[in-house]
């Protein structure tokens, strides 16, 4: 390789790709004296992290840092994004997108700590994640060299990766029979590949790993009371819980009712469409609860603007632009609007659906006196509406007259 690298920090998962990256780096970067491994615990599950440090060191790493990012992910990425109302293309709750940027930031911090001069990720050249990682690297550590093996090496398939390890007698638990590509964190789990690559195929039962099939969910609905303070979920059924515990609790409750499944074809940043199945049970409940409060407290023009911001912010997050001035500005604006978002929502979970069925807020703009269809003494002269309608429709009237 033409690059001179002395020390590199690898975003290491212990999976097949990054297991190959370690020996590949050692073989292709002669001056790479130390490979420092960074493992992010974003809530993917204890089974995925078990023995990972020993595996990294046995594969040639001089150091291995296992960093717990669960609280960081929920507090500094998920909750702020919830305040914006961002949902990519109306469906995707951005679980992988947020996690990648939290990992990239922590990876840069480890690189600075150990004095590394390079960063390495295992993202493919066809996906969004390479852009997310490297956009964050550019914003946070533009002086560091970035190594993206998938864009360099001649290994092109899962089989070739397995062959590479076998030739070097490097053990791996991976096999050539893997069906799905999955990504899990504290917010969600995603599923891609296999029969899902044909959008005419329905997802089989083995695709879903987190939520109960709605058909098999309980025949009785379950209700949860969600407390909201300044746009943040603070308690469930009156019980305040630590942030990650609260979300884990909602995940378990909603998953048992089959809530949070989506099957979408999304527009990737790299230009192609891809199909993915996502499970975000707790997040789906939170989005619905916040929507209920938003309906009560935001006036029409503010809510319309917020929806515009939500759409734009979803693209910023999806595209890996968390560490940009625009992202910071939109987060600040959403935080200001959230000051009024206080109250309680009762959500109903049943057979894969969640619905806000009761809501109240001390900042509510809803007035039963004005809204009633019965007798009222508030809007006592309905003829006042005539002047408004004439002005409101004036442009249409002028257009019609001009067309004659």
UniProtKB/Swiss-Prot annotation:
Keywords, in A-Z order: Amino-acid biosynthesis, Arginine biosynthesis, ATP-binding, Cytoplasm, Ligase, Nucleotide-binding
Domain of life assignment: Bacteria
Subcellular location: Cytoplasm
Keyword ATP-binding in record: yes
EC top class named in words: ligase
UniProt binding sites for ATP: 11-19, 40, 122
Main location: cytoplasm
Subunit details: Homotetramer.
UniProt-listed HAMAP family: Arg_succ_synth_type1
Protein's UniProt name: Argininosuccinate synthase
Organism: Moritella abyssi
Gene name for this UniProt entry: argG
